[in-house]
Protein backbone atom coordinates (compact mmCIF):
# COMPACT_ATOMS: atom_id res chain seq x y z
CA UNK A 1 0.00 0.00 0.00
CA UNK A 2 1.28 3.41 -0.92
CA UNK A 3 1.86 5.54 2.17
CA UNK A 4 1.32 8.77 0.23
CA UNK A 5 -2.17 7.70 -0.84
CA UNK A 6 -2.93 6.57 2.68
CA UNK A 7 -2.05 9.95 4.20
CA UNK A 8 -3.74 11.96 1.47
CA UNK A 9 -6.16 9.80 -0.48
CA UNK A 10 -7.56 12.74 -2.41
CA UNK A 11 -5.03 14.27 -4.71
CA UNK A 12 -4.63 18.02 -4.68
CA UNK A 13 -5.82 19.46 -8.01
CA UNK A 14 -3.40 21.48 -10.00
CA UNK A 15 -4.17 25.19 -10.29
CA UNK A 16 -4.31 25.77 -14.01
CA UNK A 17 -4.94 28.97 -15.93
CA UNK A 18 -8.47 27.82 -16.71
CA UNK A 19 -9.16 27.29 -13.02
CA UNK A 20 -7.89 30.73 -12.00
CA UNK A 21 -10.23 32.38 -14.50
CA UNK A 22 -13.30 30.67 -13.03
CA UNK A 23 -12.60 30.68 -9.30
CA UNK A 24 -12.68 33.79 -7.13
CA UNK A 25 -10.72 33.71 -3.90
CA UNK A 26 -12.07 36.01 -1.21
CA UNK A 27 -12.89 36.17 2.46
CA UNK A 28 -16.24 35.92 4.19
CA UNK A 29 -15.86 39.46 5.48
CA UNK A 30 -15.28 40.90 1.98
CA UNK A 31 -18.20 38.94 0.58
CA UNK A 32 -20.45 40.18 3.37
CA UNK A 33 -19.40 43.80 2.85
CA UNK A 34 -19.88 43.51 -0.91
CA UNK A 35 -23.42 42.23 -0.43
CA UNK A 36 -24.27 45.06 1.97
CA UNK A 37 -22.85 47.91 -0.09
CA UNK A 38 -24.54 46.60 -3.23
CA UNK A 39 -28.02 46.61 -1.66
CA UNK A 40 -28.37 49.65 0.58
CA UNK A 41 -31.97 50.14 1.70
CA UNK A 42 -32.49 53.75 2.88
CA UNK A 43 -35.19 55.09 5.15
CA UNK A 44 -36.06 58.68 4.27
CA UNK A 45 -36.58 61.12 7.12
CA UNK A 46 -37.44 64.20 5.10
CA UNK A 47 -38.78 67.24 6.92
CA UNK A 48 -37.92 70.14 4.63
CA UNK A 49 -36.85 71.22 1.15
CA UNK A 50 -33.78 68.93 1.08
CA UNK A 51 -36.09 65.98 0.59
CA UNK A 52 -37.25 67.45 -2.74
CA UNK A 53 -33.69 67.14 -4.05
CA UNK A 54 -33.55 63.50 -2.98
CA UNK A 55 -36.92 62.83 -4.61
CA UNK A 56 -35.35 63.91 -7.90
CA UNK A 57 -33.06 60.87 -7.74
CA UNK A 58 -36.02 58.55 -8.23
CA UNK A 59 -36.51 59.73 -11.80
CA UNK A 60 -34.76 58.34 -14.85
CA UNK A 61 -32.38 61.28 -15.15
CA UNK A 62 -30.30 60.21 -12.15
CA UNK A 63 -31.50 56.60 -11.67
CA UNK A 64 -30.40 55.85 -8.13
CA UNK A 65 -31.41 52.18 -8.59
CA UNK A 66 -28.00 51.50 -10.12
CA UNK A 67 -26.50 51.73 -6.63
CA UNK A 68 -28.92 49.14 -5.29
CA UNK A 69 -30.92 51.71 -3.31
CA UNK A 70 -34.39 50.50 -2.43
CA UNK A 71 -36.37 52.98 -0.28
CA UNK A 72 -38.14 51.34 2.62
CA UNK A 73 -41.10 52.56 4.66
CA UNK A 74 -40.20 50.61 7.80
CA UNK A 75 -37.03 51.15 9.85
CA UNK A 76 -36.86 47.41 10.56
CA UNK A 77 -36.12 46.79 6.87
CA UNK A 78 -33.61 49.63 6.37
CA UNK A 79 -29.90 49.84 7.05
CA UNK A 80 -29.49 53.54 6.14
CA UNK A 81 -31.43 56.57 7.33
CA UNK A 82 -31.11 59.87 5.48
CA UNK A 83 -32.10 62.90 7.55
CA UNK A 84 -33.05 65.74 5.22
CA UNK A 85 -34.35 68.95 6.73
CA UNK A 86 -34.80 70.65 10.06
CA UNK A 87 -35.08 68.53 13.20
CA UNK A 88 -36.87 70.12 16.16
CA UNK A 89 -36.82 69.18 19.82
CA UNK A 90 -40.27 67.64 19.53
CA UNK A 91 -39.20 65.47 16.59
CA UNK A 92 -35.95 64.32 18.23
CA UNK A 93 -37.46 61.40 20.23
CA UNK A 94 -39.18 60.06 17.11
CA UNK A 95 -35.92 60.20 15.16
CA UNK A 96 -34.02 58.36 17.90
CA UNK A 97 -36.78 55.74 18.06
CA UNK A 98 -36.56 55.14 14.31
CA UNK A 99 -32.80 54.79 14.56
CA UNK A 100 -33.04 52.29 17.40
CA UNK A 101 -35.54 50.18 15.43
CA UNK A 102 -33.09 49.74 12.54
CA UNK A 103 -31.10 46.47 12.55
CA UNK A 104 -27.33 46.48 12.84
CA UNK A 105 -25.17 47.42 11.04
CA UNK A 106 -26.83 50.75 10.27
CA UNK A 107 -25.66 54.06 8.86
CA UNK A 108 -26.76 57.71 8.89
CA UNK A 109 -26.39 60.41 6.24
CA UNK A 110 -27.01 64.02 7.32
CA UNK A 111 -28.25 65.97 4.31
CA UNK A 112 -28.36 69.75 4.23
CA UNK A 113 -27.29 72.64 6.44
CA UNK A 114 -30.40 72.46 8.63
CA UNK A 115 -29.64 68.85 9.56
CA UNK A 116 -25.92 69.40 10.12
CA UNK A 117 -25.90 72.67 12.09
CA UNK A 118 -29.53 73.74 12.43
CA UNK A 119 -29.26 76.10 9.46
CA UNK A 120 -31.00 79.44 9.34
CA UNK A 121 -33.67 78.23 11.75
CA UNK A 122 -31.16 77.85 14.60
CA UNK A 123 -30.41 81.57 14.83
CA UNK A 124 -33.70 82.68 16.38
CA UNK A 125 -35.46 79.42 17.30
CA UNK A 126 -35.03 77.66 20.63
CA UNK A 127 -36.71 74.47 19.39
CA UNK A 128 -34.27 73.60 16.59
CA UNK A 129 -31.68 70.89 17.16
CA UNK A 130 -28.23 72.31 16.35
CA UNK A 131 -27.00 69.26 14.48
CA UNK A 132 -28.54 65.83 14.22
CA UNK A 133 -25.28 64.28 15.42
CA UNK A 134 -26.31 65.31 18.92
CA UNK A 135 -29.02 62.65 18.69
CA UNK A 136 -27.67 59.87 16.47
CA UNK A 137 -24.20 59.13 15.02
CA UNK A 138 -23.61 60.45 11.50
CA UNK A 139 -21.41 58.60 9.02
CA UNK A 140 -21.51 61.03 6.05
CA UNK A 141 -22.32 64.76 5.96
CA UNK A 142 -23.73 66.47 2.83
CA UNK A 143 -23.43 70.27 3.18
CA UNK A 144 -25.59 72.57 1.11
CA UNK A 145 -28.90 74.43 1.17
CA UNK A 146 -30.10 72.27 -0.42
CA UNK A 147 -27.40 69.94 -1.81
CA UNK A 148 -27.66 68.85 -5.42
CA UNK A 149 -28.49 65.26 -6.41
CA UNK A 150 -24.89 64.81 -7.56
CA UNK A 151 -23.76 65.55 -4.00
CA UNK A 152 -26.06 62.82 -2.72
CA UNK A 153 -24.49 60.34 -5.13
CA UNK A 154 -21.06 61.41 -3.92
CA UNK A 155 -22.15 60.70 -0.33
CA UNK A 156 -23.48 57.28 -1.35
CA UNK A 157 -20.17 56.43 -3.04
CA UNK A 158 -18.20 57.51 0.04
CA UNK A 159 -20.47 55.44 2.26
CA UNK A 160 -20.00 52.41 0.02
CA UNK A 161 -16.21 52.81 0.28
CA UNK A 162 -16.50 52.98 4.04
CA UNK A 163 -18.64 49.84 4.12
CA UNK A 164 -16.17 47.98 1.88
CA UNK A 165 -13.26 48.49 4.28
CA UNK A 166 -15.09 47.63 7.48
CA UNK A 167 -14.62 44.57 9.61
CA UNK A 168 -17.94 43.34 10.90
CA UNK A 169 -16.42 42.02 14.11
CA UNK A 170 -14.83 45.37 14.96
CA UNK A 171 -18.06 47.25 14.29
CA UNK A 172 -20.12 45.00 16.55
CA UNK A 173 -17.46 45.27 19.26
CA UNK A 174 -17.59 49.04 19.05
CA UNK A 175 -21.37 49.03 19.31
CA UNK A 176 -21.29 46.72 22.30
CA UNK A 177 -18.73 48.70 24.29
CA UNK A 178 -19.81 52.28 23.68
CA UNK A 179 -23.03 54.14 23.09
CA UNK A 180 -23.30 55.28 19.49
CA UNK A 181 -25.38 58.33 20.20
CA UNK A 182 -25.72 60.88 22.95
CA UNK A 183 -28.01 63.77 23.76
CA UNK A 184 -26.67 67.19 24.62
CA UNK A 185 -28.80 69.54 26.67
CA UNK A 186 -29.40 72.86 24.96
CA UNK A 187 -28.68 75.84 27.18
CA UNK A 188 -30.60 79.06 26.63
CA UNK A 189 -28.90 82.44 27.00
CA UNK A 190 -30.78 85.20 28.75
CA UNK A 191 -31.03 88.29 26.55
CA UNK A 192 -32.83 91.58 27.17
CA UNK A 193 -36.34 91.85 25.85
CA UNK A 194 -36.60 93.38 22.41
CA UNK A 195 -40.39 93.64 22.26
CA UNK A 196 -41.00 96.52 24.64
CA UNK A 197 -42.43 100.00 24.45
CA UNK A 198 -39.00 101.62 24.72
CA UNK A 199 -38.50 101.56 20.98
CA UNK A 200 -41.14 104.29 20.74
CA UNK A 201 -38.81 106.59 22.66
CA UNK A 202 -35.96 106.24 20.17
CA UNK A 203 -34.83 109.46 18.43
CA UNK A 204 -35.63 108.14 14.97
CA UNK A 205 -39.15 107.33 16.11
CA UNK A 206 -39.71 110.73 17.70
CA UNK A 207 -38.34 112.66 14.74
CA UNK A 208 -38.37 110.57 11.53
CA UNK A 209 -36.18 111.67 8.62
CA UNK A 210 -37.89 114.17 6.30
CA UNK A 211 -37.41 112.00 3.25
CA UNK A 212 -39.17 109.02 4.81
CA UNK A 213 -42.67 110.35 4.20
CA UNK A 214 -41.81 111.18 0.60
CA UNK A 215 -40.42 107.70 0.02
CA UNK A 216 -43.47 106.04 1.56
CA UNK A 217 -45.82 108.44 -0.27
CA UNK A 218 -48.00 108.65 2.81
CA UNK A 219 -48.08 110.85 5.91
CA UNK A 220 -46.29 109.64 9.02
CA UNK A 221 -48.15 109.19 12.28
CA UNK A 222 -45.97 110.75 14.97
CA UNK A 223 -46.09 109.52 18.57
CA UNK A 224 -47.29 112.96 19.73
CA UNK A 225 -50.38 112.66 17.56
CA UNK A 226 -51.05 109.18 18.91
CA UNK A 227 -50.88 110.42 22.52
CA UNK A 228 -53.25 113.30 21.76
CA UNK A 229 -55.77 110.93 20.21
CA UNK A 230 -55.53 108.62 23.22
CA UNK A 231 -56.20 111.50 25.61
CA UNK A 232 -59.23 112.57 23.62
From Swiss-Prot:
Reaction catalysed by this enzyme: a plastoquinone + NADH + (n+1) H(+)(in) = a plastoquinol + NAD(+) + n H(+)(out); a plastoquinone + NADPH + (n+1) H(+)(in) = a plastoquinol + NADP(+) + n H(+)(out)
Keyword Lipid metabolism attributed: no
Record-linked PROSITE patterns: COMPLEX1_20K
Keyword S-adenosyl-L-methionine: no
Topological type in the membrane: Peripheral membrane protein
Range of residues in the leader sequence: none
GO MF: 4 iron, 4 sulfur cluster binding; iron ion binding; NADH dehydrogenase (ubiquinone) activity; quinone binding
Enzyme Commission (EC) number: 7.1.1.-
Keywords: 4Fe-4S, Cell inner membrane, Cell membrane, Iron, Iron-sulfur, Membrane, Metal-binding, NAD, NADP, Plastoquinone, Quinone, Translocase, Transport
Positions with a binding annotation for [4Fe-4S] cluster: 49-50, 114, 145
Annotated cofactor note: Binds 1 [4Fe-4S] cluster.
Names of required cofactors: [4Fe-4S] cluster
GO BP annotations, alphabetical order: aerobic respiration; electron transport coupled proton transport; photosynthesis, light reaction
Protein localization: Cell inner membrane
Principal EC category: translocase
GO CC terms of this entry: plasma membrane; respiratory chain complex I
InterPro entries in alphabetical order: NADH_UbQ_OxRdtase-like_20kDa, NADH_UQ_OxRdtase_20Kd_su
Function (record text): NDH-1 shuttles electrons from an unknown electron donor, via FMN and iron-sulfur (Fe-S) centers, to quinones in the respiratory and/or the photosynthetic chain. The immediate electron acceptor for the enzyme in this species is believed to be plastoquinone. Couples the redox reaction to proton translocation, and thus conserves the redox energy in a proton gradient. Cyanobacterial NDH-1 also plays a role in inorganic carbon-concentration.
Family note: Belongs to the complex I 20 kDa subunit family.
Subunit comment: NDH-1 can be composed of about 15 different subunits; different subcomplexes with different compositions have been identified which probably have different functions.
Name this polypeptide is given: NAD(P)H-quinone oxidoreductase subunit K 1
Organism for this UniProt entry: Gloeobacter violaceus (strain ATCC 29082 / PCC 7421)
Gene name in the database record: ndhK1
Amino acid sequence: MDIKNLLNPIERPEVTSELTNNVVLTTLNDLYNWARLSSVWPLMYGTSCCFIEFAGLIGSRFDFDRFGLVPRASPRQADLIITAGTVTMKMAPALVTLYEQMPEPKYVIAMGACTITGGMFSTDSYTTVRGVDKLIPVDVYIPGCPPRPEAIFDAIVKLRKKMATEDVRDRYEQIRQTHRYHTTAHTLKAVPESLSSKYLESPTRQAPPPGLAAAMEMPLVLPEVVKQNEQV
